[in-house]
């Protein structure tokens, strides 16, 4: 019996083996495990082994949880949880998946709190698509500090947070009020973190918090300098009460005028005379000792300028008439200048732009500009011809000076500079560089006097066609458009720099002067008023522009030198622009003169009159003088007052010859 049972058992076992299983159920393979590879909050990767390093998670980004295998997406919502550690509050999350369901994207329903620790847990409920398992995992991260924002800013009562320009700030007991988005940490409101800086350093101030530490009042306890730039600074070391971070903040502002004048107030006529006399000193006291010529600028040493010296010669006439010097002194200086010009380098009669005041040798103005400069020569001859007309031919000594001026005048070969008879004048020529500069003189700009004198020359004149085809470019110099409802007859839009209205018209009288292209009084007045109106409108919002502080022309600036104009406005006001425009805008120019002297005199007035330029926006004032800027001030003020230089130049017989030839009327 026992043997029989054994046989049955063996048979049953063999049958089971043949069927592959004794219970008719397939075996399940051992399940794998999911591997967590990365957790990121936005782009900020968490340290999965040391949560204490997770200190700067953003508050406004989703959480990315990356695994090695494809997930069972139906389990994710139950498996992932985010809590606020301090309160246990559960953060609502919405889920999506990336990377072929290997990445969970958990998007918080609201922005996370700043300066808060969060606990992220992933339970073992999470499964892989292949039933891979995952052990419980928990980590923590700390969010970045909150942002401390400036909600409002007023400087001396003026809203300043979103204003393009804060100007006219009071000079005394100035208050700056700042409201923050959060209470600030009082310990961070110290003078090293919050201060106002001026040209002379940090301004003493008091710092007071109010309104539960969310408002800061800065009171400046020292009187500010007028018409100056100041800078409010709040460093990133200013923190909120909960460590909220403030982005380093700066704000410029500009102070108002001081009602107290810098110098005693004098009559308008006395002020005009004072400015003429002080400016004249540039050409008298600072003239080159050997040659009597005008130095290019107050730092030029032996470098003298031909055109600027022409302006200086005109200024000497004013100096004599205004009794700044005697007539004899003026004649002696003219004699010295003529001695120099008669032996200085000339190129077909034209002098170079720059000359060595000791030797008379050319000093190159540029690499290829080492010869005659016809435009500078015309400015020089404008001065010499005017002085010739001032001299008394009945006096033998003065007649000798007249003869010497005529000799120089008659040997300027204006026609040579047509470059072989072309209908245009060329600016430069030198023996070795020849015509390499290739600079045709075409209008409209400061060079009208060059063509006028070329036409007036008794020995080397030009045909009228050179003027009409070259200078006037067959009429293309015309403009005719309106700017600020002011018609501009000639030139580029807005007229260009104001020296266009000065250099040619130091001697050439624009009153009632016209030709086929324009009335030149209208041209110069309208050009000036466009420049003035532009400055008052101040479209670029520069500090310091007003109906008193105006005038754009060529001058020094904080970066070097430029021809400033409404289309090249760099925030630089140049006194010669308004002051040399006295004939064209007497009221506006007088306002500017009083502003320059009484309001800016402490920084702008110097030994030779007003320094070259200033830029209140950048807190800059030039320390330079230029002959071509100082000369027109003396001369055009005199033309405004008496017409002296205009009357003298226009009395020259050659002037009428040129007017007839070119079709001018007066």
Report residues per predicted region.
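Ser/Thr/Asn(+Pro)-rich, low-complexity disordered segments
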Residues: 258-666
């Amino acid at each position: 019996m026992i043997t029989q049972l054994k046989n049955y058992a063996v048979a049953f076992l063999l049958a089971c083996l043949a069927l592959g299983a004794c219970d008719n159920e397939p075996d399940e393979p051992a399940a794998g495990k999911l591997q967590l590879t990365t957790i990121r909050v936005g782009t900020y990767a968490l340290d999965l082994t040391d949560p204490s390093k997770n200190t700067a998670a953003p508050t406004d980004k989703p959480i990315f949880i990356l695994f090695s295998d494809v997930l069972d997406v139906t389990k994710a919502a139950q498996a992932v949880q985010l809590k606020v550690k301090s309160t246990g509050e559960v953060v609502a999350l919405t889920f999506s998946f990336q990377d072929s369901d290997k990445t969970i994207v958990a998007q918080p329903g609201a922005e996370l709190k700043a300066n808060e620790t969060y606990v992220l847990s992933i339970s073992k409920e999470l499964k892989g698509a292949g039933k891979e398992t995952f052990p419980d995992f928990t980590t923590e991260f700390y969010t970045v500090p909150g942002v401390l924002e400036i909600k409002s800013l007023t400087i001396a009562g003026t809203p300043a947070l979103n204003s393009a320009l804060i100007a006219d700030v009071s000079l005394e007991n100035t208050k700056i009020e700042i409201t923050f988005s959060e209470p600030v940490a009082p310990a961070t409101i110290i003078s090293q973190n919050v201060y106002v800086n001026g040209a002379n350093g940090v301004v003493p101030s008091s710092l007071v918090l109010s309104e539960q530490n969310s408002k800061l009042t800065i009171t400046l306890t020292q009187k500010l300098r007028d018409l100056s730039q100041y800078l409010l600074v709040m460093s990133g070391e200013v923190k909120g009460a909960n460590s909220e971070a403030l982005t380093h903040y700066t704000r410029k502002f500009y102070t108002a005028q001081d009602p107290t004048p810098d110098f005693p107030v004098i009559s308008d006529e006395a002020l005009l005379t004072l400015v003429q006399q002080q400016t004249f000193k540039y050409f008298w006291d600072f003239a080159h000792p050997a040659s009597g010529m005008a130095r290019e600028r107050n730092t030029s040493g032996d470098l003298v300028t031909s055109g600027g010296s022409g302006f200086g010669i005109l200024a000497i006439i004013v100096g004599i008439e205004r009794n700044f010097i005697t007539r004899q002194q003026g004649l002696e200086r003219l004699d010295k200048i003529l001695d120099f010009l008669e032996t200085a380098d000339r190129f077909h009669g034209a002098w170079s732009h720059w000359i060595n005041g000791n030797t008379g040798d050319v000093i190159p103005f540029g690499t290829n500009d080492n010869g005659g400069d016809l435009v500078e020569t015309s400015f020089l001859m404008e001065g010499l011809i005017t002085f010739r007309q001032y001299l008394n031919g009945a006096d033998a000594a003065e007649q000798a000076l007249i003869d010497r001026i005529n000799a120089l005048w008659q040997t300027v070969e204006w026609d040579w500079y047509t470059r072989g008879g072309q209908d245009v004048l060329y600016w430069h020529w030198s023996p070795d560089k020849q015509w390499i500069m290739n600079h045709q003189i075409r209008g409209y700009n400061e060079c009208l006097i060059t063509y006028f004198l070329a036409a007036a020359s008794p020995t080397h004149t030009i045909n009228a066609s050179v003027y009409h085809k070259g200078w006037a470019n067959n009429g293309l110099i015309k403009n005719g458009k309106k700017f600020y409802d002011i018609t501009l007859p000639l030139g580029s839009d807005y007229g260009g720099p104001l020296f266009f209205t000065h250099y040619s018209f130091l001697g050439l009288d624009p009153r009632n002067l016209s030709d086929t292209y324009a009335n030149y009084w209208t041209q110069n007045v309208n050009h000036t008023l466009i420049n003035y109106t532009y400055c008052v409108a101040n479209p670029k919002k520069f500090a310091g522009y007003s109906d008193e502080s105006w005038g754009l022309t060529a001058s020094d600036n904080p970066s070097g030198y430029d021809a400033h104009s409404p289309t090249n406005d760099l925030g630089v006001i140049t006194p010669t622009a308004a002051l040399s425009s006295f004939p064209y805008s007497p009221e506006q120019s007088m306002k500017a003169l009083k502003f320059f002297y009484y309001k800016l005199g402490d920084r702008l007035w110097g030994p030779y009159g007003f320094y070259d330029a200033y830029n209140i926006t950048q807190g800059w004032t030039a320390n330079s003088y230029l002959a071509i800027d100082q000369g027109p001030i003396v001369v055009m003020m005199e033309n405004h007052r008496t017409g002296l230089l205009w009357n003298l130049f226009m009395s020259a017989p050659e002037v009428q010859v040129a007017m007839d030839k070119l079709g001018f009327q007066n």
